[in-house]
């Protein structure tokens, strides 16, 4: 699981999901990537599920890069708790993803294998995404 080693504060405000991604919109490491088309909070468990889906499909060939990190805690009150009583306890860690952000990259495999591996990873993510190639266009 991806979580920060330590944070300055235990609880944070919920991040906004408005606007396009300001950085991380291009492929830096691999040949193919997953790009977000809608805003979402991606949890550490969803990132791990997508990573496992990709690596199981490509088996021993290729390399996977994760370019997002869940650095924000999301808090929740327990079920059945009444209103008030302060902010809830941190439940899980999220990465705030804006449209246009590249989240996963893959390299060292053929285009067909990369497309299928990334499609399986997209099924694990909570927002609409697309597969892009290093040349700049859709696959």
From Swiss-Prot:
UniProt biased composition (Basic residues): 1-16
InterPro entries: Ribosomal_uL16, Ribosomal_uL16_bact-type, Ribosomal_uL16_CS, Ribosomal_uL16_dom, Ribosomal_uL16_sf
Organism superkingdom: Bacteria
Gene: rplP
UniProt GO BP: translation
NCBIfam families per UniProt: rplP_bact
Chain segments carrying region Disordered: 1-23
A cellular component term, taken from the record's GO annotations: cytosolic large ribosomal subunit
Keywords tagged on the record: Ribonucleoprotein, Ribosomal protein, RNA-binding, rRNA-binding, tRNA-binding
Assembly notes: Part of the 50S ribosomal subunit.
Record function comment: Binds 23S rRNA and is also seen to make contacts with the A and possibly P site tRNAs.
A Pfam family: Ribosomal_L16
GO-annotated molecular function: rRNA binding; structural constituent of ribosome; tRNA binding
Cysteine disulfide partners in this protein: none
Name of the protein described by the UniProt record: Large ribosomal subunit protein uL16
Family: Belongs to the universal ribosomal protein uL16 family.
